Regions:
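Positively charged, polyanion-binding regions of nucleic-acid-associated proteins
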Residues: 70-86, 98, 288-294
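Short acidic, hydrophobic short linear motifs in intrinsically disordered regions
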Residues: 75-78, 87-100, 127-135, 298-310
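Basic, low-complexity terminal or inter-domain segments flanking catalytic cores
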Residues: 61, 139-591
Length: 591
């Protein structure tokens, strides 16, 4: 792995270690379903004795429920707020990749390929070959005065007056040494070309990305969305319940565009239900009081969008290289993607452990970020590249010469040199050495292949069980992800009392029966294939791994991923067979 790829891999591996080390803590919440004049709303326990509730068991929660059931729920405070939600800035390379991942399910590579096509131009009928968007490799949110005048004229002609602000909306590009401001933000070259007018001339991916860019740009010059928020307190003495509601009173830029979100980003004003009209002193009916059990959750694994955001925040790589960085990690099988989240593979963890342990000065975030600044300064003519290369390569070459690859592999597998030196071949009594073959490292007699045939595989440390939300189909108990000789699988937590196991579903529906999920399975010889969990009722199977990409042709979520020297990296829809090329053969060969 290269300098930048290794740091990206390090982020993924370190996040996985955080998750493994995380210990969930139980806590409880209490919600009251209230009603006033026939309209219901929910209030949650906000304080106990003036402090945030600390309920860590069912008994503690039930004690509160029993106490508040006897008390009247009276409104003691009503606070109303007027909130405005401003539109986002036009896209930069990074924000385009993030938003396309959230809203369209596109990988960074898929986004940049479609953007490149739109920039290079398409034949759009009477206008002939035309570039549809501005340059797609930029850190700037700056927009030309002519483009702003054009989009304001478009909004004024096509939307009612309240949607056009009195003055243009302005956005500031982040001010730091890494930002490249030579090109303006990503926008349509002509805002009058509506997405539906050019759809017939575009491939499905190109159309969806153009629509995203066009809508975001037009929305960036529209008025804010306006909400009326209401916060109601119901003070029961020692216990305080609170309800928060929101009503959209003017949609503003939402008439055209709504931002994509990921699960961990939390609720917004759009998610809050309305609250009926209430005044201080009103008594409300309580229909139900419900305690709910929760567990604290570990930090989420990186998605493509959140990894791109973190790389940009840390100053690692350039936005234009993010797609190549992520693609390289996947192509070399350092990471795998499950339900659009990155998991490090065993190989990836091994590579990260070796590289970070032996080259700590090079493969850290600060060094890589500083190197990006120096490369930018070379480009600007402020630094001499030979001096920068010498300053880097001199210590690096010395560190490289000192590396003992065999010792690295041994260390990664927990083998100490002194222990290895003591081992003797059980067949001939000779010394034992560490070797590396096509299936990984192994121990062998020093006379192996000459006069002795003794070999011993290195046992891999079993990965810790990972909790899931799945329930056992036999007994209903929670299931965990375990690792066996043929990979990962779901197993009942009550084993050996219950021997319930099943394959891990990919979160992709079977395209044949439309009922079961697809899951990885193994042949008797251990070769992977993917099939429907309803087998033998459904016999669908494929040798190529399904990924949760959306088919641009039919909209089906589920495409086969295939990488070959002949065709490059492709995706083929499991439902309609539509095929698209994500990387040409030469790109795959150099990844």
């Amino acid at each position: 792995a290269g300098r930048v790829q290794t740091v990206a891999l390090r982020l993924i591996v370190e996040r996985e270690r955080e998750i493994r080390a995380f210990t969930p803590q139980e806590y409880w919440s209490i919600a009251a379903l209230c009603a006033k004049d026939g309209q219901t709303f929910e209030a949650s326990l906000a304080k106990v004795g003036g402090h945030k509730p600390q309920l860590h068991s069912a008994e503690e929660a039930q004690a509160v429920v029993d106490a508040v059931r006897q008390l009247p729920f009276v409104v003691t405070k009503v606070e109303k707020r007027h909130r405005r939600k401003n539109p986002g800035a036009p896209f930069t390379t990074s924000t385009l990749q993030q938003e396309a991942a959230k809203k369209l399910g596109f990988s960074s590579r898929r986004t940049m390929r479609a953007a490149q096509d739109l920039y290079e131009g398409r034949d759009v009928g009477e206008d002939g070959p035309s570039g549809l968007i501005t340059y797609m490799r930029t850190d700037s949110v700056r927009v030309s005065d002519a483009a702003i005048a054009s989009v304001r004229e478009f909004i004024g002609s096509n939307y009612k007056k309240p949607y056009l602000p009195d003055a243009p909306n302005t956005y500031s590009t982040r001010k730091n040494a890494r930002v490249q401001d030579a090109h303006e933000a990503i926008r349509p070259t002509d805002v009058r070309r509506r997405p539906e007018q050019v759809q017939q001339y575009l491939e499905p991916d190109q159309f969806r990305l153009y629509q995203l860019i066009w809508q975001r740009f037009v929305a960036s010059q529209m008025t804010p969305a306006v909400y009326d928020m209401t916060i109601v307190d119901l003070d029961l003495g020692q216990y305080l319940f609170r309800a928060t509601g929101s009503v959209l009173v003017f949609d503003g830029y939402h008439v055209l565009y709504t931002e994509g979100r990921e699960k961990e980003e939390g609720k917004t004003m759009d998610d809050l239900p309305p609250i009926p009209p209430l005044e201080q002193g009103n008594r409300v009916d309580v229909r139900e009081i419900t305690p709910s059990q929760h567990f604290t959750e570990p930090p989420p694994r990186y998605s493509e969008a959140s990894l791109v955001k973190e790389l940009e925040r840390l100053g690692i790589g350039r936005p234009s290289t993010y797609s190549a960085i992520i693609s390289t990690l996947s192509t070399r099988e350092y990471v795998k993607v499950e339900q659009r989240r990155f998991f490090p593979t065993e190989l990836g963890e091994l590579v990260e452990k070796i590289m970070v342990a032996k080259f700590p000065e090079i493969f850290n975030v600060e060094f890589t970020s500083e190197m990006e600044l120096e490369l930018d300064r070379i480009e600007e003519g402020e630094l001499v590249w030979q001096r920068v290369l010498k300053d880097f390569y001199t210590p690096f070459s010395k560190a490289l010469e000192a590396v003992d690859l065999t010792a690295l592999v041994a260390d990664a597998h927990g083998l100490k040199p002194e222990d290895l030196a003591k081992e003797r071949c059980p067949k001939c009594g000779s010394a034992i050495e560490l070797k590396t073959g096509r299936f990984g490292p192994y121990l062998a007699c020093v006379k192996y292949k000459d006069t002795c045939d003794y070999v011993k595989s290195l046992k891999k440390a079993r990965a810790p069980d990972r909790p899931t939300d799945e329930k056992c189909h036999l007994c209903g108990s929670p299931m965990v992800i375990k690792t066996g000789r043929f990979g990962e699988f779901l197993a009942c937590t009550t084993y050996p009392a219950c021997k319930g196991t099943r394959a891990i579903p990919l979160g992709i529906k079977c395209p044949k029966c439309l009922e079961g999920d697809l899951a990885e399975r193994r042949t008797k010889r251990g070769k992977s294939f993917w099939g429907c969990v309803r087998y033998p009722a459904c016999d669908f199977s494929t040798w190529n791994k399904p990924v949760p990409d959306t088919c641009p042709e039919c909209g089906w979520v589920g495409m086969e991923k295939k990488v070959s020297k002949a065709e490059g990296e492709t995706r083929t829809c499991l439902k309609c067979g539509h095929k698209m090329v994500l990387a040409e053969p030469e790109e795959v060969a150099t990844a």
